[in-house]
Amino acid sequence: MNNEPLRPDPDRLLEQTAAPHRGKLKVFFGACAGVGKTWAMLAEAQRLRAQGLDIVVGVVETHGRKDTAAMLEGLAVLPLKRQAYRGRHISEFDLDAALARRPALILMDELAHSNAPGSRHPKRWQDIEELLEAGIDVFTTVNVQHLESLNDVVSGVTGIQVRETVPDPFFDAADDVVLVDLPPDDLRQRLKEGKVYIAGQAERAIEHFFRKGNLIALRELALRRTADRVDEQMRAWRGHPGEEKVWHTRDAILLCIGHNTGSEKLVRAAARLASRLGSVWHAVYVETPALHRLPEKKRRAILSALRLAQELGAETATLSDPAEEKAVVRYAREHNLGKIILGRPASRRWWRRETFADRLARIAPDLDQVLVALDEPPARTINNAPDNRSFKDKWRVQIQGCVVAAALCAVITLIAMQWLMAFDAANLVMLYLLGVVVVALFYGRWPSVVATVINVVSFDLFFIAPRGTLAVSDVQYLLTFAVMLTVGLVIGNLTAGVRYQARVARYREQRTRHLYEMSKALAVGRSPQDIAATSEQFIASTFHARSQVLLPDDNGKLQPLTHPQGMTPWDDAIAQWSFDKGLPAGAGTDTLPGVPYQILPLKSGEKTYGLVVVEPGNLRQLMIPEQQRLLETFTLLVANALERLTLTASEEQARMASEREQIRNALLAALSHDLRTPLTVLFGQAEILTLDLASEGSPHARQASEIRQHVLNTTRLVNNLLDMARIQSGGFNLKKEWLTLEEVVGSALQMLEPGLSSPINLSLPEPLTLIHVDGPLFERVLINLLENAVKYAGAQAEIGIDAHVEGENLQLDVWDNGPGLPPGQEQTIFDKFARGNKESAVPGVGLGLAICRAIVDVHGGTITAFNRPEGGACFRVTLPQQTAPELEEFHEDM
């Protein structure tokens, strides 16, 4: 094969060398619970145990399934570690015992499981990571909804937010992933038969999470995720040394763009084919020594075709190789592209016996070719209007080269005439060939052709008898002339090609040096002005162009950072359009192409940070594909530098905000501590005074009761300040326990009973609804929400608490029929020190709802606010429901 072998990736070889020291991870992957992941894992473990492998069961959840429990027979089970937590004993995986036991393989069910507080790692996947680092192989299971990248997608489909997730990099790093699949109808039948959940849970699951539409969507996500992983494995394997053939595992298209007319038709045909096949496609153009002979019009057509391909979804590249077919085949093999799309001109010149398609088929017969007919014949190079000046400049150089060629031939002839007596005439041919090489080296192909012809004529006139005429006395000299002409043409052509390759190499070295120097200069920039000055300096030196960097001000209006002299004023409307759309405008684009400048957006990722306006001295030089690609790379470097400044500024603001918050919390905590003791004493004295005056029947008993109530309100405010400071500093431990919802609500109502003028409407689910919460903290949430309703809805307003279980979540609403929330403040009302109506006479500092959100967040839930259609406000708390303990265990804990 004519292609050079691909060199192995050193990083990949290092990874392969280090791989055997780490345990292997095998993931049994499924769409949802009940598809048979655990059973498949145990079946594989039983097969390996029969082969003599040392296997230990670390954690396997049978969920009461008899067939799953039966698969555990014969397997060694590692005892779970029981640890005390708030008076209860929780069983968790014993990581230290597993490391001490060091089996060859350990089974770890439910990869996304969250460990109990006090464990070494908060997540089970972190336990597995430590096992792998110790060289122990691991089998585990996970559902698609637990992958971090798909968590939002799944919640959008099912309406249920899954809290336990696994980072995608950990899943992707698994050595093997086994997809365990089950059709939705079969899975629903298993649910009905009680093979997944117990009867009551199964009925609710079928109506909510396990709806057929949900199962189909989850199944598609699991299949796609597995297919993407398999495709990535195939690509990684193809990177191994020696894998050079294209694998036709899926349709992938490579479009070859030439300099013939009709390239845009070719691009559109490739895009249509890729769309029908649902495949990826690439578009490439190969730079050859012939490129420098193309007129600027054709170069712009090549650039336009590459841009069109990129707009239509292709990955574009510009290759460089004297042999086009070798570059195309090498690129196709590197990217596993099995279909090559080529343009077939309408006519074929008689002297071209082998076309590009023929050469491609000869060196790569395994690649499929798709030929697209070009309606127009190959365009000839004509000096028409837009390129007259450029062609004149080129012809001026060519004519100068021809004059130099003639002069050099004359000098060689004079020297050879002096040496004629010492050397044979045939040996003087070498001098003429040397002249051809010199002309080709400095002036290119056509002057070397002229030099070759003049040399042959001069040799005949001055050195072959009869001298002074073109006639020859010996027919053998005709062969000498033919060889001399042929060798001269070949040497001239080869020398011109070498000259072009040297020029290309010099250009690439210069381009690389400019990119390196620019990136180094941008890296030390500390302000947008530094970035703008650096970019304008390098654009001026590289492209011989003036430029301006435009950045948006606080109002979004684009403003220049510098004011270079002599630039054409740019159009504000077009610049704003380019910034808003993130698309280039001006010369060489489809938007305002007649202006003498080009506007390029400074984009990094999906965000546009500004614009750069470039006005070159020679617009044609800027329009050639190589220069355009270099300019686009420059703009990307500038955008990355601006992004770095933005991120640095955001980080600094966040740091300062955090420091301010810490100081404020410390001040509030200190102030609240100083106030708590006198308030406690004052409340006690007010309580005694109220009771004494009431027992005496004093008319001042009412005033004493008001004093007591105001002291109580102030005490609650101080407690809120302390709680917020404690939550923000992280200085509290969440002490969850199993409580009934009725108990928590009743306790909160009892605390507020003196301040409630009317009873609360309650609508709670069936008795003994268990919630896993920190009792005092969650009571504080209900107290704050009810106090908020009493304050803003009025003492005579109707207030209620509704609760119901929806799927895997408990939804609790605290509502009233008061004036409702101010429009647009449904989210900001939960901020610290935020109040719905700042001019309101209702006392308070705006901490109650902020504390509610903080407490709900640490419980893994959410809290939202909205106005009810029938009037009034509603605050909704959503908590994830965990599997409740068995009733007997619950009574023991109670």
Curated annotation (Swiss-Prot):
It is found in: Cell inner membrane. It is an enzyme of class 2 (transferase). InterPro entries: GAF (IPR003018), GAF-like_dom_sf (IPR029016), HATPase_C_sf (IPR036890), His_kinase_dom (IPR005467), HisK_dim/P_dom (IPR003661), HisK_dim/P_sf (IPR036097), Histidine_kinase_KdpD (IPR052023), KdpD_sf (IPR038318). It comes from the Bacteria. It catalyses: ATP + protein L-histidine = ADP + protein N-phospho-L-histidine. Residues 424-427, 467-474 are periplasmic. GO terms for biological process: cellular response to potassium ion; signal transduction. The modification Phosphohistidine is found at H673. One of its GO terms (molecular function) is protein homodimerization activity. The keyword DNA repair does not apply. Its EC number is 2.7.13.3. It is a multi-pass membrane protein. Residues 1-400, 445, 499-894 are cytoplasmic. Keywords: ATP-binding, Cell inner membrane, Cell membrane, Kinase, Membrane, Nucleotide-binding, Phosphoprotein, Transferase, Transmembrane, Transmembrane helix, Two-component regulatory system. The chain crosses the membrane at residues 401-423, 428-444, 446-466, 475-498. CDD domains: HATPase (cd00075), HisKA (cd00082), USP_KdpD-like (cd01987). SMART domains: HATPase_c, HisKA. It holds the Pfam family HisKA. Residues 670-883 form the Histidine kinase domain. One of its GO terms (cellular component) is outer membrane-bounded periplasmic space. In the central section; belongs to the universal stress protein A family. Member of the two-component regulatory system KdpD/KdpE involved in the regulation of the kdp operon. KdpD may function as a membrane-associated protein kinase that phosphorylates KdpE in response to environmental signals. This is Sensor protein KdpD. It comes from Escherichia coli (strain K12). The gene is kdpD.
